[in-house]
């Protein structure tokens, strides 16, 4: 289900990440020990320090930087197109009610088109680790969208505009409530996501709800910048990265366990052990 508390958690996480990044130095104005990505953002993950890194402690090749995307990709991992079959994808979507708007919006082909832009997804480790990442991604997507039922947040009254953010100022009349597979929200997420993907996320945030490829790209953008790096720590770390403030440390065990349940279900379908540290 898509709801305001989870969207707020995503937004707060992104705000904390943004606050920790930029400061003083080099092309991006990054702190020492931060990389300036090819898109001009500061960070320490492969998305920043890998392919196209402009300055800072760049890593040649990056984690999954080569070509391949949906069918193959970077260094090690899972073949995404072979793992996310029609049966797997539609097995999730078919559990949504017949009246759900997302049933005619989210498609496997849109996901595979989007994942081509993120060759590091499900790569950088072993095949088992890659399959676990795929299972984790779709577990969170299932939970956030109600098995691909929802495209946009149910409650659209909140604009999710952080007026204090001068780098990504809100556009007049626009609202930045949750949209897409991971329900991206807040102006400071829509702005950089749009810039990286190739649309004006501040002036036209609704593109995420109109174009399924862009919708999946925004989800993968958030995932690769905030979640991918914690996958080796176990599924529980991905919950903490996405909605830890509201679900971890006993705050909402029912919601946390629902995510874990989807993850274990998808790991079983993909014939991989879910690994340790499933909760947070």
Curated annotation (Swiss-Prot):
Q: Which GO terms describe its biological process?
A: amino sugar metabolic process; cell wall macromolecule catabolic process; chitin catabolic process; defense response to fungus; polysaccharide catabolic process
Report the main location listed first in the record. Answer: secreted
Chain spans, region Catalytic: 78-280
Q: Where is this region: Hinge region (poly-Gly)?
A: 61-77
Sorted alphabetically, the keyword list is: Allergen, Carbohydrate metabolism, Chitin degradation, Chitin-binding, Disulfide bond, Glycoprotein, Glycosidase, Hydrolase, Plant defense, Polysaccharide degradation, Secreted, Signal
One MF term from GO for this chain?
chitinase activity
- Catalytic center residues: 144
Chitin-binding type-1 domain: which residues?
Answer: 26-60
Activity regulation: the record says: Inactivated by l-ethyl-3-(3-dimethylaminopropyl)carbodiimide (EDC) in the absence of exogenous nucleophiles (e.g. GlcNAc4, GlcNAc3 and GlcNAc2). Not inhibited by tetra-N-acetylchitopentaose or modified chitotetraose substrate TMG-chitotriomycin-pMP, containing a free, non-acetylated glucosaminyl residue or a N-trimethylamino glucosamine (TMG) residue at the non-reducing terminus, respectively.
Q: How does activity depend on pH?
A: Active between pH 6-3.
User: What CDD domains does the annotation carry?
Assistant: chitinase_GH19, ChtBD1
InterPro entries in UniProt:
Chitin-bd_1 (IPR001002), Chitin-binding_1_CS (IPR018371), Endochitinase-like_sf (IPR036861), Glyco_hydro_19 (IPR016283), Glyco_hydro_19_cat (IPR000726), Lysozyme-like_dom_sf (IPR023346)
Give a GO cellular-component term.
extracellular region
The answer, when asked if Glycoprotein is one of the entry's keywords, is: yes
Q: How does activity depend on temperature?
A: Active between 50-70 degrees Celsius.
Question: Could you tell me which cysteines form disulfide bridges?
Answer: 28-36, 30-42, 35-49, 53-58, 100-149, 161-170, 248-280
- Give the signal peptide, or none: 1-25
Name the Enzyme Commission number(s) assigned to this protein.
3.2.1.14
This chain is glycosylated at: 155, 277
Supply the Gene3D superfamilies for this chain: 1.10.530.10, Endochitinase, domain 2 (3.30.20.10), Endochitinase-like (3.30.60.10)
Q: Which PANTHER family match?
A: CHITINASE-RELATED, ENDOCHITINASE A
Q: What is known of its domains?
A: The N-terminal domain is not required for catalytic activity, but it is involved in substrate binding.
This chain's function reads: Defense against chitin-containing fungal pathogens. Hydrolyzes glycol chitin and tetra-N-acetylchitotetraose in vitro. Its action is countered by fungal polyglycine hydrolases and fungalysin, that cleave the chitin-binding domain from the protein.
User: To which protein family does this belong?
Assistant: Belongs to the glycosyl hydrolase 19 family. Chitinase class IV subfamily.
Q: What is this protein called?
A: Endochitinase A
State the species of origin. Zea mays
Q: Which gene encodes it?
A: CHIA
């Amino acid at each position: 289900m898509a709801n305001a508390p989870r969207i707020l958690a995503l937004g707060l996480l992104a705000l904390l990440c943004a606050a920790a990044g930029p400061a003083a130095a080099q092309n991006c104005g990054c702190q020492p020990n931060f990389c300036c990505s090819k898109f001009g953002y500061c960070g320490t993950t492969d998305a920043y320090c890998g392919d196209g890194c402009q300055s800072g402690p760049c890593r040649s090749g990056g984690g999954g930087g080569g070509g391949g995307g949906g069918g193959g990709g970077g260094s090690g991992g899972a073949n995404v197109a072979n793992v996310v079959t029609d049966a797997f994808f539609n097995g999730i979507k078919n559990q949504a009610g017949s009246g759900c708007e997302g049933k005619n919006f989210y498609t496997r082909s849109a996901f595979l088109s989007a994942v081509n832009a993120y060759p590091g997804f499900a790569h950088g480790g072993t095949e088992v680790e890659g399959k676990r990442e795929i299972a984790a991604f779709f577990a969170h997507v299932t939970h956030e969208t109600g098995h691909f039922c929802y495209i946009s947040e149910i409650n659209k009254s909140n604009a999710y505009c952080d007026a204090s953010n001068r780098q990504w100022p809100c556009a007049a009349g626009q609202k930045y409530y949750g949209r897409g597979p991971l329900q991206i929200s807040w102006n400071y997420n829509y702005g950089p996501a749009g810039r990286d993907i190739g649309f004006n996320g501040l002036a036209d945030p609704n593109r995420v709800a109109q174009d399924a490829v862009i919708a999946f790209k925004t989800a993968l953008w958030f995932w690769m910048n905030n979640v991918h790096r914690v996958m080796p720590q176990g599924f529980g770390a991905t919950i903490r990265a996405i909605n830890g403030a509201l679900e971890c440390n006993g705050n909402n065990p029912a919601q946390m366990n629902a995510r874990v349940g989807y993850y274990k279900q998808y790991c079983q379908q993909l014939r991989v052990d879910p690994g340790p540290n499933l909760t947070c």
